[in-house]
Amino acid sequence: EAERDKQQALIMEMSTPVMQLWDNILLLPVVGLVDSKRVQLIMETALQKILDYQAKLLILDIQGVPAVDSAVANHLIQITKATRLMGCTSIVTGISPEISQALVNLGIELGDIQTQATLKDGVSFSLANLGMKLQTINTN
């Protein structure tokens, strides 16, 4: 039983990877179904990594989330508020047309939460926010 609990905890931890993309920028890709237990783990993991890396921006990519209901949307809002309290701006990326429509139909206001259509847009926005940009180098 203890071994099973350990394995379950490891699986949950692996399902919420937070990685550093750049100085002050973290990425948290969320894949699969999100319930309240998982959201709690996502929040705890994100807040700890923000502290560890002294991050100023967290990209929360939800492209891999198949559906969002009002509970999940409210949890995402809570995560962005918690990160803001730590001095870190959250950027939600990967909002599909279906999720966008569901949020509108549910009457959920994202308020002042920063959103970008794609992860690429979120990375560009984050770099610009820090006064940087990616540039193509001509090697000819």
Cite the ranges covered by each PLM segment.
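Amphipathic alpha-helical interaction surfaces in cytosolic regulatory modules
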Residues: 64-109
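Short, charged amphipathic alpha-helical "coupling" segments at sensory-output junctions
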Residues: 2-13
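Short acidic-hydrophobic, aromatic-tinged amphipathic segments that line or gate anion-handling sites
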Residues: 111-122
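STAS-typified acidic loop motif
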Residues: 21-43
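A short, well-ordered alpha-helical element
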Residues: 36-56
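A charged, well-structured terminal subsegment
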Residues: 120-136
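Short, glycine-/small-residue-enriched flexible loop/hinge segments at domain edges that mediate gating
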Residues: 51-70
